[in-house]
């Protein structure tokens, strides 16, 4: 692994600082770790480069790292010593991003990968193989739905879809081959906040970890605080924030007991033939509670190769530094847009947590802190034709497939992001013919409303 990750997980485990002196981020450490988001995203994982004193995180654009001697190399490959080997598996720039997001989420360690899709796939593949299954919420991003409904099935991993509004549906779909539960915190496009604590508690009793995609709720929800075991991110979205780079992250809480139900989690509790027969829950005990993430790094990432580039990691570090400020504006603008659209005659329905009531509102209030997200959905009265006309009439909004950009974005999911889904699958995920997804940016709210109004007037 890496010296910097060792520092982080040892500190998380309460071990003395003397065990983690040599770090790629330097020894200039603050005596008290920052506890507030706005400080964590600026300081966690890096103070100054030990060689140059650079305050900005250096881009380590290299494939390989020099070994001190033959013994050092052998120890690294045997996990007897932590350090950098090859940038497909670990890189000092990526390491800072990993430490920073792990600290942001209150987790033990993280793994940077090439995209959000890679993060979702690896998070599952780290626990499930052919013949196994996971239980997933139906409320998913279209790309994740396709991954689970088709590609995972081709790999022999069954994904059982259940209604996320009923936590007990996860228990009902579970059998002795169920390895994980999966859901999105603020699912796109329905935007109904997932009952994290309820499903996590069910999973804990059964030895099943809850994997949460927190992409749309970065900075406003901490799933680990509610019992989730693993978080995945598309860093492409709000963490990056400027539409410049593709990337993903897997974050390990370090709190899930993988040994409590060894038959439920065999790939962490039985010898792994791909790594000298290592039993992961035992092999990493001297490092910290990071069996899940170390296995993901040293087997799944090693073999499938979906690594994040150091340059992209640098871009995400830059974005992360302003995440709290941007999310405040995203959320403020999105709520204002949702309230305004609710009174527009061309709009049949508005989808946003601010417009919800009952259980859905209670969950949004419980799990979202500091805002209700930057996404707004609306259903236009004219259906598909109205959706197309509206999209084509926008002037300031960009018509793109991304979300979480500083700029305002719009798309018609039924004919784009969810077009590979059947009509029934589209309905299950919350996409209707007239549904338009808006990713509200950080522009002035008056300019956002003006562009929406002129486009709606043409529908």
Feature locations, PLM:
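Conserved C-terminal alpha-helix-loop-beta "cap" of PLP-dependent enzymes
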Residues: 327, 335, 341-342, 346-436, ...
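Conserved PLP-enzyme active-site core in the AAT-like
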Residues: 31, 41-43, 47-50, 109-343
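Conserved N-terminal alpha-helix of the aminotransferase class I/II PLP-enzyme fold
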Residues: 64, 69-121, 143-151
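Glycine-rich beta-alpha junction loops
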Residues: 46-48, 61-67, 237, 254-255, ...
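PLP-dependent enzyme catalytic core of the Aspartate aminotransferase-like
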Residues: 17-21, 26-29, 149-150, 158, ...
């Amino acid at each position: 692994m890496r010296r910097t990750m060792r520092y982080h997980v040892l500190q998380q485990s309460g071990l003395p600082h003397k065990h983690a002196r040599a770090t790629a981020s330097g020894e200039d450490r603050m005596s008290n770790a920052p506890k507030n988001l706005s400080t964590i995203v600026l300081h966690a994982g890096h103070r100054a480069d030990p060689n140059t004193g650079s305050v900005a995180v250096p881009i380590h654009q290299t494939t390989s790292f020099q070994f001190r001697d033959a013994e050092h190399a052998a120890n690294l490959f045997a996990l007897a010593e932590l350090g950098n080997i090859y940038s497909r598996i670990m890189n000092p720039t990526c390491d800072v991003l990993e430490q920073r997001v792990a600290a942001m989420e209150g987790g033990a360690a993280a793994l940077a990968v090439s995209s959000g899709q890679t993060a979702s796939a690896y998070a599952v593949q780290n626990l499930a193989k052919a013949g196994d299954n996971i239980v997933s919420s139906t409320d998913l991003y279209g790309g994740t739905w396709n991954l689970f409904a088709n590609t995972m099935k081709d790999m022999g991993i069954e994904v059982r879809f259940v209604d996320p509004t009923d936590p007990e549906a996860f228990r009902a779909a579970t059998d002795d081959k169920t390895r994980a539960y999966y859901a999105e915190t603020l699912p796109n496009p329905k935007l109904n906040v997932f009952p994290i604590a309820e499903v996590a508690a069910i999973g804990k009793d059964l030895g099943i970890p809850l994997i949460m995609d927190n992409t749309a709720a970065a900075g406003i929800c901490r799933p680990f605080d509610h019992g989730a075991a693993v978080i995945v991110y598309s860093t492409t979205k709000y963490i990056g924030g400027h539409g410049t780079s593709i990337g993903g992250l897997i974050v390990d809480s370090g709190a899930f007991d993988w040994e409590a139900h060894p038959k439920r989690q065999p790939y962490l509790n039985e010898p792994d033939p791909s790594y000298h027969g290592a039993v992961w829950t035992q092999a990493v005990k001297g490092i910290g509670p990071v069996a899940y993430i170390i296995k993901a790094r040293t087997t799944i990432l090693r073999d499938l190769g979906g690594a994040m580039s150091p340059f992209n990691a640098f871009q995400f570090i830059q974005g992360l530094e302003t995440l709290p400020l941007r999310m405040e504006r995203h959320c403020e603008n999105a709520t204002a847009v949702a309230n305004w659209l609710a009174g527009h005659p061309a709009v049949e329905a508005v989808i946003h947590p601010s417009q919800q009531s009952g259980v859905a509102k209670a969950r949004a209030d419980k799990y979202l802190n500091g805002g209700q997200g930057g996404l707004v959905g609306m259903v236009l009265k004219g259906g598909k034709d109205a959706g197309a006309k509206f999209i084509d009439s926008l002037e300031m909004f960009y018509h793109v497939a991304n979300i979480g950009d500083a700029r305002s974005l719009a798309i018609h999911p039924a004919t784009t992001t969810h077009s590979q889904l059947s009509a029934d699958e589209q309905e299950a995920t919350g996409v209707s013919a007239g549904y338009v997804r808006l990713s509200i940016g950080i522009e002035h709210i008056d300019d956002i409303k003006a562009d929406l109004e002129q486009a709606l007037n043409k529908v």
